């Protein structure tokens, strides 16, 4: 994750474009949370990348879409009493999520082709942006692969595929954010000496693991099972955490265990950030920003859990995880600039 030694000098248009793409990903993550929490994701039973851009417009078309939905496990086991009006609401939420995905893809692709044609990008950047374009395409396929898992014999999507879908979004966001930072933040004015970056890599790694764990929590509906916080409750014992055999399957299949791990990692990240700030005395703006965002994220997570996963709160919790991840990347970027500045000052 070397994001310093290759600082990029690009035109203002490229910087704005990268920023818009990052915002687009965040909006997608937020809308994706709403789509999942409103149980809208399985309402569209086909994947049509081109003609799927047009929604049903007549009553006959809507009825045809509902008939397709009636063949799904979700309809058979959960929503068999759904009216056409209610179905339209679910359908339009999923439709908007897919439409936004197409728009974000085009917002990346069209300016990329333009900047490449105008020779505004270096050869290295072109190669990296081709990778991002490929990942965006794969993400579309991954989204359908996830939805398909809920159309066969279970009324919900695979939590593994849900986690893969979210992690792929995180990878795309990371690449866009990294290049945005490289193009915008070149130098800083600060005299603090930081000799080791290991702790910052640990923070980034833990946040990434936490986002993965959060996806598993969401996919397993772990936040809805009990209002006893596993980490704090005396009602949750070892047998609850390890009842699946072999024991390691609990790590990714047992909702109680996954929720427990999610809480422990959150506490661990907080402890490491506080130690870095107070004990290691890395008192720089990105460190304070990370701590502030972490406290906001912890608050959102606790409120989401206590209030039975309300849609807006839970969606904010999901997108704030990406913003927290972005702040950790910014922190590492800043620290590496400090190291370069320190070496230059010594010379």
UniProtKB/Swiss-Prot annotation:
Residues the entry annotates as binding heme: 262, 317
Q: Where are the transmembrane segments?
A: 14-34, 96-116, 129-149, 162-182, 199-219, 260-280, 287-307, 311-331
Write down the membrane topology. Multi-pass membrane protein
Q: Which cofactor(s) does the record list?
A: heme b
Biological process, per Gene Ontology:
heme A biosynthetic process
Q: What is its subcellular localisation? A: Cell membrane
Tagged with keyword Oxidoreductase: yes
Cellular-component GO terms for this entry: plasma membrane
Q: Which GO terms describe its molecular function?
A: metal ion binding; oxidoreductase activity, acting on NAD(P)H, heme protein as acceptor
Catalyzed reactions: Fe(II)-heme o + 2 A + H2O = Fe(II)-heme a + 2 AH2
Q: Which InterPro entries match?
A: COX15/CtaA_fam (IPR003780), HemeA_Synthase_type2 (IPR023754)
Q: Which UniProt keywords apply?
A: Cell membrane, Heme biosynthesis, Iron, Membrane, Metal-binding, Oxidoreductase, Transmembrane, Transmembrane helix
Pathway as given in its UniProt record:
Porphyrin-containing compound metabolism; heme A biosynthesis; heme A from heme O: step 1/1
**The protein's Enzyme Commission number:** 1.17.99.9
Q: Where is the signal peptide?
A: none
> What is the protein's major site of localization?
membrane
Assembly notes: Interacts with CtaB.
What does this protein's UniProt record list under function?
Answer: Catalyzes the conversion of heme O to heme A by two successive hydroxylations of the methyl group at C8. The first hydroxylation forms heme I, the second hydroxylation results in an unstable dihydroxymethyl group, which spontaneously dehydrates, resulting in the formyl group of heme A.
- What family is it from? Belongs to the COX15/CtaA family. Type 2 subfamily.
The name this protein goes by in its record = Heme A synthase
């Amino acid at each position: 994750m070397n994001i310093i030694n290759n600082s990029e000098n690009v035109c203002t248009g490229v910087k704005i474009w990268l920023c818009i793409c990052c915002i687009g990903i965040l909006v997608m993550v937020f809308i994706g949370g709403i789509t999942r929490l409103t149980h809208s994701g399985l309402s569209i039973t086909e994947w049509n990348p081109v003609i799927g851009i047009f929604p049903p417009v007549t009553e006959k078309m809507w009825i045809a879409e509902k008939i397709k939905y009636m063949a799904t496990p979700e309809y058979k086991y959960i929503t068999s009493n759904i009216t056409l009006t209610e179905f339209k609401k679910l359908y339009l939420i999923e439709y908007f999520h897919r439409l936004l995905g197409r728009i974000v893809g085009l917002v990346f692709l069209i300016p990329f082709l333009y900047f490449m044609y105008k020779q505004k990008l270096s050869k290295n950047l072109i190669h990296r942006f081709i990778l991002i374009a490929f990942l965006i395409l794969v993400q579309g396929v991954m989204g359908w692969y996830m939805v398909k898992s809920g159309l066969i014999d279970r009324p919900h999507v695979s939590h593994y595929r849900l986690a893969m879908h979210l992690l792929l979004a995180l990878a795309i966001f990371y690449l866009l954010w990294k290049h945005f930072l490289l193009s915008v933040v070149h130098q800083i004015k600060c005299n603090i000496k930081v000799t080791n970056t290991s702790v910052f890599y640990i923070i980034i790694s833990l946040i990434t693991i936490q986002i993965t764990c959060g996806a598993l929590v969401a996919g397993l509906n772990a936040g809805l099972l009990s209002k006893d916080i596993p980490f704090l409750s005396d009602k949750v014992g070892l047998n609850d955490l390890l009842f699946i055999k072999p024991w390691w399957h609990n790590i990714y299949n047992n909702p109680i265990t996954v929720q427990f791990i999610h809480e422990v990692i959150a506490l661990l990240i907080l402890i490491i950030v506080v130690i870095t700030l107070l004990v290691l005395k890395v008192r720089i703006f990105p460190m304070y920003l990370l701590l502030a965002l972490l406290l906001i994220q912890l608050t959102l997570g606790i409120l989401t859990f206590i209030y039975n996963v309300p849609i807006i709160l839970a969606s904010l919790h999901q997108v704030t995880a990406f913003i927290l991840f972005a702040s950790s990347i910014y922190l590492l970027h800043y620290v590496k600039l400090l190291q370069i500045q320190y070496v230059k000052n010594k010379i």
